[in-house]
C-alpha cells in the first residue's frame, strides 16, 4: 500500500474524508506546531440515499424510554441522544465508520481510530510521571502505572493468583482450562501465549537471536 498522509473514510452510503494539514497552512493551522485533521464535505457513493434522521438504521430498533434511548439489540439505554444510539447500533450492523488509509483497519468510533493513527505517526502523548515512559493510548498508560502502584485487579478464581494486566490474566486462566490458542504449523503443537509460539518457531527456523560473546 502506498505510503502517504493518514486519512479517514466512512464505510457506508456516503463517504467522509479527513485530510491532514500542517500549522498555518491553507489558513487552517493552529500555529502550535501540530498537525490538524480537517473534515471534508460528504461525497455520495451513488448508493440509495437514506433520510438524515435515520442514518441507515431502522426506526424499529430505536425505542424512546423517558430521557434516554434504548437499543433493542442489546438492551443498553445509556444514550441521551438519538444520534448516539444510531452510532451504537452500527456496532450491531457491522458498520465501521473510520477506516485507516495506511493499513485498511476500520473502527466503529473515532475514539479508537485516533489512537490507532498514532501507531503510524509514532506519536505517544501519554507520559508516565513516575518513569517517563510514553504511550499512544491513555488506557495503556493506566495499565503501565500499576507497575508503580502494585495494583493487581485481576484475580484467578481457581488459584487466587493476581495480575496487573488483563492479557496476562487471560493467558494464566488457560493453564486451568487447557485452552491453547496459538498453534505451530510445522508440528501442530499448541501454546498458551504467542510469545511461547514465537520461541518454539525459532527451533524450526534455526534463528538464534541471543548470541553469546
Swiss-Prot record:
InterPro entries: Znf_C2H2_sf, Znf_C2H2_type
Main location: nucleus
Tagged with keyword DNA-binding: yes
Compartments in which it is found: Nucleus
Function: May be involved in transcriptional regulation.
PANTHER family given in the database record: ZINC FINGER AND SCAN DOMAIN-CONTAINING, ZINC FINGER PROTEIN 80
Protein's name in the database: Zinc finger protein 80
Phylogenetic lineage: Eukaryota, Metazoa, Chordata, Craniata, Vertebrata
